[in-house]
């Protein structure tokens, strides 16, 4: 961890330049501990994805690493495998801390760590809001080797001196662009101050806005930079369609027509506000369409139930805000509908990335009103569409 690295100041905002091109194209060649390798294969991996081929080895070797890669490329397993390789299973203390922007993503990462580490004596705790502070404190006092959490709760537990950082080897920031854009900057900077100087920093982000680049210059030492190129991202496998809807009020009928004509395995419909999610859910339900909805105003328990139903397939259409656009991995999502176009291009990447996880094919349909046209042209230019 560094405080004044200047190596990235010349990098243009938006995309980093790779400075590392070594590829390890099989898990067997990574010299992973036997019980970890067994867990990797038991989880269902056969060969590493593009980011796993490039990033796992430098992380295991101890380098600070910046990886620019989108959700759906296998990055969760990248840092999970690396962390599990590095921790001392005999030491009951937090050695790897992983931050994520939402509770759902933190819980998902925890499940991946636990599953891949199934044959190791490893504990992984999800340190998130929505569960009682007392429960959190008890779990942390047991000394889990890996802690996954959201910035607010992790910061609180460190300040209470319940989450001890003395033995910390690795600090991972997943979806760094999202965390920093949602007002977690101060808490994240504070967390850095509590970590030992020797802590390895791994940062993952789909986009590289200025606030992310500032973190890399302040806290990382000569980082290995890995860019998984756009051609290797999940957008490549996603067909994008634009439907011109002259007026906002015509969107509902357009969606109803689509619903009746398109065969959907599972779909996510994105709206820009929580109020719109509730309104659209009510309107579609009144038309006898079966849908479920999720947004940040809901209790954590309710959100967990909805996600469980959606993952299991008992619910096939989910209406959501951007809360869901980051990192929620539902394997069968084949269609994403932007009922409202997102406010920025970063969220567009994350939203439609739901429909092509790990390189699978998917479809994104965007409803475009006259007011949206200028933004659409701009987004298309930036995406090379």
UniProtKB/Swiss-Prot annotation:
Residues 56-226 form the Helicase ATP-binding domain. One of its GO terms (molecular function) is ATP hydrolysis activity. One of its GO terms (cellular component) is cytoplasm. It is an enzyme of class 3 (hydrolase). Its EC number is 3.6.4.13. Keywords: ATP-binding, Cytoplasm, Helicase, Hydrolase, Initiation factor, Nucleotide-binding, Protein biosynthesis, RNA-binding. Belongs to the DEAD box helicase family. eIF4A subfamily. The Q motif is unique to and characteristic of the DEAD box family of RNA helicases and controls ATP binding and hydrolysis. This is ATP-dependent RNA helicase eIF4A. It comes from Ajellomyces capsulatus (strain NAm1 / WU24) (Darling's disease fungus).
